[in-house]
Amino acid sequence: LVLIAFIFNIILVALKKWTKFRAIFTTGHVQVQQASTAFWLILFCFPALGDTPILLIMALLLGLYWAAGTNLTVEISQDLTDGAGFSIAHQQMFGLKLFSWLSEKMNKSGKRQSKRLEDMQLPGFLSIFNENMVATSILMTLFFGAILLLLGKDYLIEAKFLAEGKSFLFYILTTCLNFAVYLSILQLGVRTFVGELTQSFQGISQKLLKGAVPGVDCAVAYGFGSPNAVTIGFLFGALGQFLAIGALILLKSPTLVIAGFVPVFFDNATIAVFANNKGGMRAAMLWPFVSGLMQVFGSALIAGWVGMAAYGGYLGMWDWAVVWPIFTVLMKYLSYFGVALVAIFLLAIPQIQYLKDKKGYFLVTEDYEAYKALKAEK
């Protein structure tokens, strides 16, 4: 199934003269996760359908979703990286486009533009937060330290996280500081990865799929813009999720969502990086918080409705908590007409993008310097 959907994605890009798709979804582990979740959602919508028709519908919709989603992030990725030659292929592609657009609108409509995090210089002793490693270490110590203190030493020993007789304080410090170290390693390695990937993809984009770019894991964005945006996005996304979880408890929701690290971190950190690039610090704090709320409420609704809550979990990433529940409603209540509507919607996305910027649409991937010159003239 993943292979068929991937080939369909490639065909759509190969026919870009008509389809207007420009990016290929290359994040393999994400493709497998999404195929598993899509299978359940489509089976829920068409329980009496045979294996082959379900697989065909899945391949069609996933191939279109991968092509449309990665295509949505082309311009914002090129803008963030100054033409590095990739787009984002992950679980929050529609969210990245939406929040980037909202960030830009918010910054333009405000009386005073919000500075980007990388442009801010804190005064006095606060200047230590200008260094990403220090800022992340302190913030994570406060954040995770508070959680670990609430859990308590006895619980950590019982759960075998902490050995008997070991220092509880030292465990908190090393756990929090390790997070900062691992994040720094991830950010440092990203630029090397991007350089190698774009170089290896050049042959394909020049010979076989002219002007196409690879859609890659969202973590590649962490090597661009402000490193502190990653930490800010994680913290405010977590606050949004915790608030939403509290609301579910107060409202006695039949489905209770527990915050998972991957949706909290990778969705909201990535949203913050792109939001900061378009709208500065305010956007980097606001939109991950809103995203956290949407992740929890959306996941609770869809997981409870389709029955996945009974099996212990759901892929609570942004697109699958917000966009795919809408697709599922259309397919459930409109049957094959709903499938057609979803397919038409995904096919229409690049067409609309193209109509909004005919001159620059393909130029942004083929010659970014010329694209910037074109935009400067307007």
Please state what every model-predicted region is.
Residues 2-196, 208-217, 307-378:
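Signature of multi-pass transmembrane helix bundles
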Residues 14-22, 218-304:
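Hydrophobic alpha-helical bundle architecture
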